[in-house]
């Protein structure tokens, strides 16, 4: 009930202003009695992923809490893990406003945020300051003004700084809102990046005496051949996991709606089937050697179960969480326990 009232107010506001207000409010209330308005108890449904044990298979996707400011509040809602970021080595403002748009009739969102964040050093401070013991994955990317050819350096800088504090690290090469970023998904650029990241991971594991798994986040706008090539590169470079998928550049199912022609990545319900298709194709290519987090268009427990059936071990929500609220977490976990 509280969420529906809050949502009604927020949906009258500019989307980015509403988002910032929500994150700020959650930051203030995460460890206070006021978290009673969104705190919920989720029955355990443990799942093992990349060698880690999570209390349940439902996570918060990257992009909601980019700078890790409200981790404790999201823990109170019952998430099994939170993925913060995308974070870059240096702070950057992102793309020009406006850059976030609701497509309410389709339960979709278009964003062209452009990795706006306060930088990796700020994120590390927030990871150190968090009170809860929730699993936190850190999604890393490159700065906009870093040439693609030098992009791997940005990923290695972020890895070096977040490694001691992350449950896992997610490598984001699939956002459509940083020029040239998606080119890292192909050919020699992909192989060079994954090889450099794996080498760095092993160095850091030795230095810190702990192994932090690494997953690659991919786009939904890929051909089967491209998916096969990515799968081969993941296996070759012994990556620990994959996250499928990011937002799409397609506009299937939203034609004619207000804001549908805005540039950027489309998420939410219009992405559901495409994301599930990519998960199924990727799982077939990986042949059980590398586990997958399924994300994209999960608006119900049924949507999540479809991701599991397609080959995902865990799922993440973002747009569905905005439209459905924290109850979606509990609904998915309960359905997972019964499946």
From Swiss-Prot:
Task: Kindly list the positions annotated as binding substrate.
Answer: 66, 111-115, 172, 177, 246-247
Q: Which domain of life is it from?
A: Bacteria
The UniProt entry annotates the active site at 175
Spell out the subcellular localization from the entry.
Answer: Cell membrane
What are the entry keywords? Cell membrane, Flavoprotein, FMN, Membrane, Oxidoreductase, Pyrimidine biosynthesis
State the reactions this protein catalyses: (S)-dihydroorotate + a quinone = orotate + a quinol
Q: What class of enzyme is it?
A: oxidoreductase
Per its UniProt record, what CDD domains does this chain match? DHOD_2_like (cd04738)
Q: Work out whether the entry's keyword set contains Metal-binding.
A: no
Q: What Gene3D superfamilies does the annotation carry?
A: Aldolase class I
Cofactors (names): FMN
- Tell me the membrane topology, using the record's own terms: Peripheral membrane protein
List the record's Gene Ontology CC terms alphabetically.
cytoplasm; plasma membrane
InterPro entries annotated for this entry? Answer: Aldolase_TIM, DHO_dehydrogenase, Dihydroorotate_DH_1_2, Dihydroorotate_DH_2, Dihydroorotate_DH_cat, Dihydroorotate_DH_CS
Q: State if Magnesium is listed as a keyword.
A: no
- EC number from the UniProt entry: 1.3.5.2
How is the cofactor bound, in the record's words? Binds 1 FMN per subunit.
User: What are the recorded GO MF terms, alphabetically?
Assistant: dihydroorotate dehydrogenase (quinone) activity
List this protein's GO terms for biological process: 'de novo' pyrimidine nucleobase biosynthetic process; 'de novo' UMP biosynthetic process
Q: Where does the chain bind FMN?
A: 62-66, 86, 139, 172, 217, 245, 268, 297, 318-319
> Any idea what job this protein has?
Catalyzes the conversion of dihydroorotate to orotate with quinone as electron acceptor.
The entry describes its oligomerization and partners as:
Monomer.
| Alphabetical list of PANTHER family matching this protein | DIHYDROOROTATE DEHYDROGENASE (QUINONE), MITOCHONDRIAL, DIHYDROOROTATE DEHYDROGENASE (QUINONE), MITOCHONDRIAL-RELATED
Q: Which HAMAP family match?
A: DHO_dh_type2
The record's similarity note reads: Belongs to the dihydroorotate dehydrogenase family. Type 2 subfamily.
Q: What is this protein called?
A: Dihydroorotate dehydrogenase (quinone)
Q: Which gene encodes it?
A: pyrD
């Amino acid at each position: 009930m509280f969420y529906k009232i809050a949502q009604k107010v927020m949906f009258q506001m500019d989307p980015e202003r509403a988002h910032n207000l929500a994150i700020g409010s959650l930051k203030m209330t995460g460890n206070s009695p006021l978290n009673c308005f969104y705190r919920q108890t989720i029955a355990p449904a443990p799942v093992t992923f990349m060698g880690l044990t999570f209390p349940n298979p439902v996570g918060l996707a990257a992009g909601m809490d980019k700078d890790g400011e409200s981790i404790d509040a999201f823990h109170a809602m019952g998430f099994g893990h939170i993925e913060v970021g995308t974070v870059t080595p240096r702070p950057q403002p992102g793309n020009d406003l406006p850059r976030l748009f609701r497509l309410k009739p389709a339960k979709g969102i278009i964003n062209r945020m452009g990795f706006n964040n306060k930088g990796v050093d700020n994120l590390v401070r927030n990871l150190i300051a968090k009170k809860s013991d929730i699993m936190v994955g850190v999604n890393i990317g490159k700065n906009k003004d870093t040439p693609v050819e030098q992009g791997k350096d940005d990923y290695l800088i972020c890895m070096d700084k977040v490694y001691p504090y992350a449950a896992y690290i997610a490598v984001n090469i699939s956002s459509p809102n940083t020029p040239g970023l998606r080119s890292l998904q192909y050919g020699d650029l992909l192989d060079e990046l994954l090889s450099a990241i794996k080498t760095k991971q092993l160095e850091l594991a030795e230095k810190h005496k702990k192994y932090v798994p690494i997953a690659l986040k991919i786009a939904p706008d890929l051909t089967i051949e491209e998916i096969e090539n990515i799968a081969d590169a993941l296996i070759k470079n012994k990556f620990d996991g994959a996250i499928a998928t990011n937002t799409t550049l397609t506009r299937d199912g939203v034609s004619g709606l207000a804001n549908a022609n805005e540039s950027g990545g489309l998420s939410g319900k219009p992405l559901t089937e495409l994301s599930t298709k990519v998960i199924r194709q990727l799982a077939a290519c990986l042949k059980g050697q590398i586990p997958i987090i399924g994300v994209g268009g999960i608006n119900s427990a049924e949507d999540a179960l479809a991701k599991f059936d397609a080959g995902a071990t865990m799922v993440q929500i973002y747009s569905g969480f905005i439209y459905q609220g924290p109850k979606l977490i509990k609904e998915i976990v309960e359905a997972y326990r019964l499946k």
